[in-house]
Design a protein with these regions (language model features):
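Repetitive, compositionally biased segments used for assembly/scaffolding
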Residues: 19-136
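Sec-dependent N-terminal signal peptides
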Residues: 4-15
C-alpha cells in the first residue's frame, strides 16, 4: 500500500520547468512515465506515451484531472506544507518540505514516504526507507 501511495504522490507531485520533460522510473530503473510542463499545466503520460492525467496550477492551488478531464483532486500549498484533497475536498495526505527532503504523510498523519532532491534528480522512498522510484 505504501508503494502505491508513493507512486501516486510521485505522479501527483512530479513537476518540471516550463517546456521540460521529466522521466519517472520505478525502483528498478524502468521508465513508468513522463511529466511535461508548459506554463501552468503539466501533462502526465505512462511508459507508452498515453496521457494518464493533467495538473493545472493557479496561484497556490493545483487541480489534478484524470485522462478524461474529470477533476480527481487538489493540492494547496501554504508555506512549506502542501495539503492533498480528493475530488470531494477530503484531506488524503500532506507533504512537508525541509531542506532537500519532503516527507509525505497520509490523512492520519502517519509517514508514508519521503522524497530527497539532489542536484540531478529526486529519489522516492517508502515509509521503511526502501527506494520505490526516481525522477530525473
Amino acid at each position: 500500500m505504501n508503494r502505491i501511495l508513493i507512486i501516486a504522490f510521485l505522479l501527483l507531485t512530479a513537476t518540471a520547468f516550463c517546456g521540460e520533460r521529466e522521466t519517472i522510473r520505478d525502483a528498478h530503473g524502468k521508465v513508468v512515465g513522463t511529466a511535461t510542463t508548459d506554463g501552468n499545466k503539466t501533462v502526465y503520460r505512462d511508459a507508452h506515451g498515453k496521457v494518464t492525467g493533467t495538473a493545472t496550477t493557479n496561484g497556490n492551488k493545483t487541480t489534478y484531472r484524470d485522462a478524461t478531464g474529470k477533476a480527481v483532486g487538489t493540492a494547496t500549498e501554504a508555506g512549506n506544507r502542501t495539503t492533498y484533497r480528493d475530488a470531494h475536498g477530503k484531506t488524503v495526505g500532506t507533504a512537508t518540505e525541509s531542506g532537500n527532503k519532503t516527507t509525505y504523510r497520509d490523512a492520519t498523519g502517519k509517514t508514508s514516504g519521503t522524497a530527497t532532491n539532489t542536484g540531478n534528480g529526486t529519489t522516492y522512498r517508502d515509509a521503511t526507507g526502501k527506494t520505490v522510484g526516481t525522477k530525473r
